[in-house]
Amino acid sequence: PQAAALHPDSINCIRVATFVKDGEPLVIYAACKAGTGGMAFDNMGRGGITMRFDLDTGKIAGQGHDEELKKYDRHPTTGIELKGYQMPMHEEVKALALKAALMYPEFHYVGWDICMTEKGPAIIEGNDYPGYDLAQIPDDGDPHPRYGLIPRFEKYGIEV
């Protein structure tokens, strides 16, 4: 219900980007995706918004952004305040992404779109090129607007 409340007409996923290094799955970033305006999709390219997501707390960690980089403090359809919004099953979502990454280690960098169901998290798809845009769009007041993903890869000794 909490994930659906964000935008009831779409399946609102958590994108968890993983990288497998030396047989160990690592989380590079996570983002929450939600549809808008009655649409059934959560994709930015079809009118959805995306927000940085903290897998440790299960909370949306920043503003929403659409494909034109318009920023939203509140969901444009439901009016729900985005930053700090608690999504369910974040620990299970993270565990599922790491497990999936180990099942396909030949694909080193994958973005797993995971939805929350009544029976637990479920993978909708794995993207073998999840891109970098979802995690690098700066928020207003972001103390590190040029932070990007390079430090996240370097943290694990991954050359980019």
What are the language-model segments listed below?
Residues 53-55, 65-76:
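Solvent-exposed helix/loop surface patches that form functional interfaces
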Residues 60-66, 157-160:
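A general structural signal for short secondary-structure boundary/capping elements
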Residues 28-30, 112, 126:
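Generic beta-strand hydrophobic packing signal
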Residues 1-64:
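Phosphate-binding site of ATP-dependent enzymes
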